[in-house]
Amino acid sequence: MLGVTNTTRSLREFWCTELPDHIVGLAFRPDAGLFAAASVTGPIHVLSATDGAPHALFAGHGFGTSGISWSADGTLLASIGQDGVVKAWDVARKDMAWSGEATAPWAERAAWSADGTLLAVAAGKLVRLWNRQGQLLRTFGPHSSTVLDIAWKPQSRQLAATSYGCVTLWDADQPEPVRTYRWQGSSLVLAWSPDGRYLATGDQDATVHFWITKTGRDYQMSGYPRKVKELSWDGSSRWLATGGGSQACVWDCSPPGPNDREPLILEAHDRSLTTLAFQHRRELLATGGAEGRVMIWRPSRGRGAVSASEEGPAITQLAWSPDDQVLAAGDEAGRVRLFRVLK
């Protein structure tokens, strides 16, 4: 097995539950007591993070759920789907708090602001903002093409949105863009560094684009076997992990930037790497593959995996608990497993 050495430990789950279908979303509540799992057919399960006991079951979206996001205080769980509707679920009452139209046949992304007061939703060429009470506050766009991803700048009211040829930066309190980062290509995903200094995109043309946000200076990293749909920053904002093949490429983005540096290549999976996620504040990187294996890495100390699970159905989602001690993994068969990863 690639990446596995004689020091690689077995990664063992402390509980597992089986849901009806392919997992498309996993998210821990900010207090880590509950987490939500969304399936491709629509239902959203809210489970105890301790033992997997059911807490609530929400209907989700009739044509399938495409994304979920917790508010900062953990009271509301937002969901979007192929029905073009955004919904906010009251987790304590176990009922829907409100819903709104996303203005397109399907919604691509939903994300709460860091303070939990604003919910952003991307649908078609528009991005819309709602408050916690379900009041529509603002509509951004139309953009140059379908907005495939959005992300709030850390600890800020600024929101980045991808469309063909650019990343557009909006301020929640202004009707016009704050800044536009241009390049000729189509970005599929974007990720802010935790300190807000850098913005990275994974792209349709099998590249990664990287901006220093203050100056607008940009870099492009190429050579990936396929389009790049997996990005994750470590908590220090130094390391950017990327997919785009069977390997994980980890770039050193400390000043002056990743240009002219060779990435650390982690020989991660026998088949395609499907998802990856750094811990929030620590140094461990989790990867999941099409062969069903979950692997844990410490890139700062070399190329060998720290621990690895057994193979199974393809991994579709990974999520770290807020305290970085538990890793959740969802797969294409509907299985959700939790692993305890202390250090």
Tell me the role of every PLM-derived stretch.
Residues 1-343:
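WD40-repeat beta-propeller superdomains and closely related acidic/aromatic-rich repeat-like regions
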